[in-house]
Amino acid sequence: EVELVIRLGENLLPESMCVGCDTTNRTHQGLAKENGWPWTEGKSFRGSAVLGTWTDWNEDIKEISLSVNDELRQNAKTSLMVHDIKSLLFHLNRWYELSPGDYIWTGTPKGVGPLKIGDRVYATMSDVDGIIVSKLDAICIN
C-alpha cells in the first residue's frame, strides 16, 4: 500500500516527505488475528516498509500512486485523506512522544492488494503541477 511519509524536524513539524510502501505478511497477520496476538509479525519484518526519494516538505502535494507490474493499483489525491497532516500530528503528539527525525506514515487510499515474489512495485508522489517529487521502484523479495 502506498502512503505519504513525513519526517519531523526540530519543532516536530514536517521537514521532509517521500512516498512509501507499507506491506503486510497476511499469513502472519491472519494467525495473529485468530489467536488474539499483536500484529507485529505481520507488519514489522525485514523489507516491510520501503521509502522513496526524500524531498523538502510542501503542503501542496496532490497525488500519490502505486503500480504493480505496470498495472495501476492505487491513485488518490491527498486532499481525500481522512485526516489532514496538521490534525494527524496534533493527535499523535497527544498520545505518543514524538521526536525530531520520526517518520509519520499517513495512511493509504483504496486499492491495496497482494504482492508476489518478483513483482515490480513503482510508487510516486506528485505536486500540483503533476511533477513527480518522490518515487520508489522496488522488486518484491518476501
Regions found by a protein language model. Name each.
Residues 1-103, 111-142:
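Catalytic-core "active-site belt" of small-molecule-metabolizing enzymes
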